[in-house]
Amino acid sequence: MPGAGDGGKAPARWLGTGLLGLFLLPVTLSLEVSVGKATDIYAVNGTEILLPCTFSSCFGFEDLHFRWTYNSSDAFKILIEGTVKNEKSDPKVTLKDDDRITLVGSTKEKMNNISIVLRDLEFSDTGKYTCHVKNPKENNLQHHATIFLQVVDRLEEVDNTVTLIILAVVGGVIGLLILILLIKKLIIFILKKTREKKKECLVSSSGNDNTENGLPGSKAEEKPPSKV
């Protein structure tokens, strides 16, 4: 029967899917390399710039290998290479192509930092800088991240005029609304007090009228006792 055959294949299919998921899980949760949120950075000619790079691994690392490479439209070169023995060791440089480069990272205290500083920038330093990491503990799994550096004459100042105008307008509107609410509350308070005073005056005036007209309950109703 077709139904019986399908019933026998279903468990095998689910088992195969589960095994595939277990096989792919270490890949998705393993080695990661990051250069931060800003992948495009600018620096002034003649200054220095920090090129950040950190890595992480859920399975730890041993004899980890890293390198920084430079790539532009007409050049490619390895800037610096090194290794990290384990989590308790600092990075060790094995190759450096440019004396202007300094490794400033540390892997102690789980920082896993292999950032570099590039000094005395030149316009020719403009290009892509890629941080590569290979972890032998994860079957030589590799990962990388790239920063684009643009060397300029000077950094352009950001014009915040529009932002300041918007903030001023918004602040003015909020202040006006608060002022209107305060005035409204003040008017309501004054009207309430005025009504209370009018009510007191009416009650007092009514009492005086009763007294003058000799109505029951007034002093005019009282008579002196008659003499026998």
Curated annotation (Swiss-Prot):
Disulfide linkage: C53-C131
UniProt effect for mutating C58A: Abolishes regulation of channel activity
Extracellular side: 31-162
TM stretches of this protein: 163-183
UniProt-recorded Gene Ontology molecular function terms: sodium channel regulator activity; transmembrane transporter binding; voltage-gated sodium channel activity; voltage-gated sodium channel activity involved in cardiac muscle cell action potential
Bias kind Polar residues: ranges: 203-213
Membrane topology: Single-pass type I membrane protein
Keywords: Atrial fibrillation, Cell membrane, Disease variant, Disulfide bond, Glycoprotein, Immunoglobulin domain, Ion transport, Long QT syndrome, Membrane, Signal, Sodium, Sodium transport, Transmembrane, Transmembrane helix, Transport
Bias type Basic and acidic residues, positions: 219-228
Gene3D superfamilies referenced in this protein's UniProt entry, alphabetically: Immunoglobulins
Cytoplasmic side, ranges: 184-228
Annotated glycan sites: N45, N71, N113
Domain Ig-like C2-type: 31-148
Presence of the UniProt keyword Signal in the record: yes
Subcellular location: Cell membrane
Gene Ontology cellular component annotations, sorted alphabetically: intercalated disc; plasma membrane; voltage-gated sodium channel complex
Tissue specificity comment: Expressed at a high level in dorsal root ganglia, at a lower level in brain, spinal cord, skeletal muscle and heart. Expressed in the atrium.
SMART domains recorded: IG
Name of a matching Pfam family: V-set
Region of interest: Disordered: 200-228
Signal peptide: 1-30
BP terms from Gene Ontology: AV node cell action potential; cardiac conduction; cardiac muscle cell action potential involved in contraction; cardiac muscle contraction; establishment of localization in cell; membrane depolarization during cardiac muscle cell action potential; neuronal action potential; positive regulation of sodium ion transport
Family according to the record: Belongs to the sodium channel auxiliary subunit SCN4B (TC 8.A.17) family.
Disease in which the protein is involved: Long QT syndrome 10: A heart disorder characterized by a prolonged QT interval on the ECG and polymorphic ventricular arrhythmias. They cause syncope and sudden death in response to exercise or emotional stress, and can present with a sentinel event of sudden cardiac death in infancy.
Summary of subunit composition and partner proteins: A voltage-gated sodium (Nav) channel consists of an ion-conducting pore-forming alpha subunit functional on its own that is regulated by one or more beta subunits. The beta subunit SCN4B is disulfide-linked to the pore-forming alpha subunit. Interacts with SCN1A; regulatory subunit of SCN1A/Nav1.1. Interacts with SCN2A; regulatory subunit of SCN2A/Nav1.2.
Protein's recorded name: Sodium channel regulatory subunit beta-4
Gene: SCN4B
